[in-house]
Amino acid sequence: MAAAAGMMLLGLLQAGGSVLGQAMEKVTGGNLLSMLLIACAFTLSLVYLFRLAAGHLVQLPAGAKSPPYIFSPIPFLGHAIAFGKSPVEFLENAYEKYGPVFSFTMVGKTFTYLLGSDAAALLFNSKNEDLNAEDVYSRLTTPVFGKGVAYDVPNPVFLEQKKMLKSGLNIAHFKQHVSIIEKETKEYFQSWGESGEKNVFEALSELIILTASHCLHGKEIRSQLNEKVAQLYADLDGGFSHAAWLLPGWLPLPSFRRRDRAHREIKNIFYKAIQKRRQSQEKIDDILQTLLDATYKDGRPLTDDEVAGMLIGLLLAGQHTSSTTSAWMGFFLARDKTLQEKCYLEQKTVCGENLPPLTYDQLKDLNLLDRCIKETLRLRPPIMIMMRMARTPQTVAGYTIPPGHQVCVSPTVNQRLKDSWVERLDFNPDRYLQDNPASGEKFAYVPFGAGRHRCIGENFAYVQIKTIWSTMLRLYEFDLIDGYFPTVNYTTMIHTPENPVIRYKRRSK
């Protein structure tokens, strides 16, 4: 098989040699250095493809059956263009043709998808030493969060850090957060006036940062969140891009430089707040204090750099989920005015006719609003793909996935498979009144992941979104503009609504 791969390489060299020579003459004008650089790039690309092909062939154990492979005639890029244009359609078509497990190549990497609850169980039940997260996510998150936290550390250390953060995301804190978020929301929407048309995704993204910073970072850091710092967060958030995923971090791209500068400046803000809190010795019951008091199993306390990195990670990891989900839910409610009015009336039924300030216990009883969030997360999960790198051979559905494959689950596809969901494309919050809306399948609904990989910020996200939308429903009625319901923007890593402008009108008292 390796010999066959070698013959393939020779064929490519022979076929490409004359074409390359002609192209080089035209592009470089005969400049020797330019011609050498292009020739080297061409040769290295072919060697890379040879190693990829040979590796794909020899890494399977004897007698093992590899997943169905979707061939592409396009070298290196593979299916990147088709997938990037319409990833959900691509995966659903592949599922219909090849079944729940299949592989394909994009940008020189082989991806194996596990669609449907049974196949997805492999990823969600896996151990990190078999299907590894750091190998996939570190290059994306480390420049944003910083060294020494999250996917930059061995998994046991990361698990300890997650446990520290989770201890601060508790009901006692959530009860404090509700009034904070309600106050921030009312203040933010004062500038909207009586009626108008606004980019609701942009507005909610700003509001999510304000509320999350206040709740998760403490009053010292929130007090410094002005327009300049908000732009730093935006630049840092810009580090979550396709370019950052695919290209080396040392490249001098403008977005990389903005990301790195923002990281340094935000860290400095955090360092000052951390030092001020340490020196004051004032014990404030918030997550910043939780981290300052926390220790690893060996008794070592967190450094200021670790605390700052974990606070950045906590904010930005949840910011996408909450802002995207909040915006999409606004459009679903604007499209169904009857449902929107039911959500408003639920506020009066649960909280009181005069709509007093919200409490955590009231939030828990807003069941219809809760189901609307759940259904929004089903049809528009912010994270379309969850990935791991196979470090050991993995067997699923009779196939063996070799080491080196990026193993993927798509919540977007799993949560709308016709094999699992009745009226799968309809926005129907009442489906969750049933005990088993997805035929009892364990991994059919996974917007926050599952098992040991489940997101620790899920409960905070629900508190945040329910409080914001409770306040918004009390303030305004929302409508689509000329019936326009946004399409999905697949060019970003978080799948946001295209042209997310909504019409609003203040409710009469």
UniProtKB/Swiss-Prot annotation:
* Localization per Swiss-Prot or TrEMBL: Endoplasmic reticulum membrane; Microsome membrane
Sorted UniProt keywords: Cholesterol biosynthesis, Cholesterol metabolism, Endoplasmic reticulum, Heme, Iron, Lipid biosynthesis, Lipid metabolism, Membrane, Metal-binding, Microsome, Monooxygenase, Oxidoreductase, Steroid biosynthesis, Steroid metabolism, Sterol biosynthesis, Sterol metabolism, Transmembrane, Transmembrane helix, Ubl conjugation
One Pfam family hit: p450
What reaction(s) does this enzyme catalyze?
a 14alpha-methyl steroid + 3 reduced [NADPH--hemoprotein reductase] + 3 O2 = a Delta(14) steroid + formate + 3 oxidized [NADPH--hemoprotein reductase] + 4 H2O + 4 H(+); lanosterol + 3 reduced [NADPH--hemoprotein reductase] + 3 O2 = 4,4-dimethyl-5alpha-cholesta-8,14,24-trien-3beta-ol + formate + 3 oxidized [NADPH--hemoprotein reductase] + 4 H2O + 4 H(+); 24,25-dihydrolanosterol + 3 reduced [NADPH--hemoprotein reductase] + 3 O2 = 4,4-dimethyl-8,14-cholestadien-3beta-ol + formate + 3 oxidized [NADPH--hemoprotein reductase] + 4 H2O + 4 H(+); a 14alpha-methyl steroid + reduced [NADPH--hemoprotein reductase] + O2 = a 14alpha-hydroxymethyl steroid + oxidized [NADPH--hemoprotein reductase] + H2O + H(+)
Q: How is its activity regulated?
A: Inhibited by azalanstat. Inhibited by azole antifungal agents ketoconazole, itraconazole and fluconazole.
Q: Which residues cross the membrane?
A: 30-50
The record, for InterPro entries, names: CYP450_sterol_14alpha_dmase (IPR050529), Cyt_P450 (IPR001128), Cyt_P450_CS (IPR017972), Cyt_P450_E_grp-IV (IPR002403), Cyt_P450_sf (IPR036396)
Q: Which GO biological process annotations does it have?
A: cholesterol biosynthetic process; steroid biosynthetic process
What's the PTM story here? Answer: Ubiquitinated by MARCHF6, leading to proteasomal degradation.
Query: Which cofactors, if any, are listed as required?
Result: heme
Q: Name one GO molecular function term.
A: sterol 14-demethylase activity
Q: How does it sit in the membrane?
A: Single-pass membrane protein
Q: What does the similarity note say?
A: Belongs to the cytochrome P450 family.
Q: Which PANTHER family match?
A: 24-HYDROXYCHOLESTEROL 7-ALPHA-HYDROXYLASE (PTHR24304:SF2), CYTOCHROME P450 FAMILY 7 (PTHR24304)
Q: What is this protein called?
A: Lanosterol 14-alpha demethylase
Per the UniProt entry, what species is this protein from, by scientific name? Macaca fascicularis (Crab-eating macaque)
At the highest ranks, the source species' classification is: Eukaryota, Metazoa, Chordata, Craniata, Vertebrata
